């Protein structure tokens, strides 16, 4: 979900799929 969380800058924490 990197793209979805990328906006919230949580790509590092929630970058699973």
From Swiss-Prot:
Its main location: secreted. Keywords: Secreted, Toxin. The keyword Hydrolase does not apply. This is Toxin Plt. It comes from Parabuthus liosoma (African black tail scorpion). Expressed by the venom gland. It is found in: Secreted. The lineage of its organism: Eukaryota, Metazoa, Ecdysozoa, Arthropoda, Chelicerata. GO terms for cellular component: extracellular region. GO terms for molecular function: toxin activity. Shows moderate insect toxicity coupled with mild effect on mice.
């Amino acid at each position: 979900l990197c793209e979805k969380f990328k906006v919230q800058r949580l790509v590092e924490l929630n970058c699973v799929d």
